[in-house]
Amino acid sequence: VCGTDHHIFQGEAPAEPPVILGHEMAGKVEKTGENVQNIEFGDKVAVNPNIHCGHCYFCQRGEINLCKNLQAIGVTRDGGFAEYVVVPETNVHVFTGDISYEEGAMVEPISCCLHGIDLVKINSGATVAILGGGAIGLILAQLAEMAGAARVYISEPDPRRRKIAKNLGFRDVFSPQEIKEKIFEHTMVGAEVVIEAVGVETTARQSLNLVREGGTVLFFGVCPEDLKIPVSPFDIYKKELTIKGSNINPFVTERALDILTEGKINVNKLVTNRYSLKQLPEILSGEIEDSGLKSVIVFN
């Protein structure tokens, strides 16, 4: 269950009913189409939900995540909150070994985070600040360390999530009220890279106050379309700031699967709740408190 599913259910994200939600998924192949060549019955697969057209200006340039005709399984067409889902062959990725279906369902968020980390080009020894200690924030934090960050700061208001972050081995985990003082106490100048991984006004504003001169701010968290924050062009000019956005996961799903298969990232500690499909409406409506980090829908 992704935060986007909650936003769609509450009418805050662009999806039109009737559509079955669920874009983070893994499962077993039950049937293949007559033209399918590389996928077989019984294969365990993770799904990349994003389907690009291959013909528009951006697709022709290799920028498939910016496709003008982009479709998304679980957003614009029926998704994984069902016993069966139809997926194009090009969007399924076979995994083997000891990878569980729960881990396989995390390939999609890992791949999105991997694209974001690629965009900010973390230098060896860099200081990185992650605003948001949810599942996405903690995936980003692990990938930032893999990319060479010497110190990763995590800002998270929920003490339960801060505890999980520390259990993953991160020492610099603080509340939003503490994070600025702690970063400047260590660096004197601010973080080289700041990643906003929540998608709300307070963290969007704060991100610009934590980055050092010559640094990069990445807006990763999906925010409401009408959210606006004040930005000073003079500060961007004077400090030579780079401000970027990160949108889905072009050409990185296999890399994400490899990282997971090789044990380079821990997602098991991120899954804190397991529910049945029948409980899904209560989760999305808030009747069941979706506490902890990541909730998964388990099919028996």
Regions found by a protein language model. Give the residues of each.
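C-terminal hydrophobic helical "lid"/dimerization subdomain
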Residues: R205-N209, P250-N300
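Residues in the short beta-alpha loop(s) of Rossmann-like NAD(P)-binding domains
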Residues: P157-D158, C223, N249
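Short glycine-centered segments of the SAM/dcSAM-binding site in methyltransferase folds
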Residues: K44, T127, G215-T216, T242
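Mid-domain Rossmann-like dinucleotide-binding core that forms the NAD(H)/NADP(H) cofactor-binding site
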Residues: I99-E178
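Glycine-rich cofactor phosphate-binding loops and adjacent beta1-alpha1 units
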Residues: V120, K163, N167-E240
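NAD(P)H dinucleotide-binding glycine-rich loop of Rossmann-like/cofactor-binding domains
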Residues: C53-L131
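Glycine-rich beta-strand-centered segment in the early N-terminal region that forms part
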Residues: Q10-Y57, T96-D98
